[in-house]
Amino acid sequence: GVKYDVGMESRHDTKEDIAPEEKNNIVQDITYVAILKDYGKDVTIPCPEGYNKDEFACACASHVCIMPKEPDRVWSKDMMITYGKLPNNKYMINWPIEGNDYYVNLIEMTREEREEALKYAKHYTMCFVYFLQHELGFNTLGLADDEYPTADKLPFIPYHRESRRIHGLVRFDLNHACEPFRQSQPLYRTCIAVGNYPVDHHHTRYHGYEELPNLYFHPIPSYGLPLGTLISKDVEGLI
């Protein structure tokens, strides 16, 4: 089959100065995004089993925020809730700062194992919804009943930030993005897609995230993705 990498590669393999010393299989946090709607009345849900407000205490500046994980990223309550404001009095809840990000590596699980693991990710989002309602006073906001045709009113799938990275004909790394004209391989000449976003990893729900490289909005210029990254070097005719 197609060979691939998962997690973070070693700096010895990629020559990236922000990569870890040793490779690991730690993927980015996923998020079970929720769409809330303002019902104009108290719609606070029952307290979810195992709820712990401390896990969300510094999602924003509030009376319960004492020791934030990321002191320079504590937004106001209003900025936090309006970050994903939508039309029709709805709000997207996809909040990485002590919010509903959730760590699980689903990549090599069976279908049954994934379904079971995602129950916990959904539950974590519902705990955050309860935190918003009960601790922060957003008690008129509840899961929108007209957004997703699902029994639990949550999306069909979570927000995945990372997947397998195949072993392609070429490897595109941070150095090619940052300094495309100084590399031994002029991969920029074969680009088929462009990107324009910093290196933004979500890891704070991983237990032990403090030991990982700080990859929060590491700046890079706009870049081109070369065709060779999408063509497997092991399997003929896949693409």
Please tell me what each predicted stretch does.
Residues 2-239:
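Flavin (FAD/FMN)-binding glycine-rich loop and adjacent Rossmann-like elements that form
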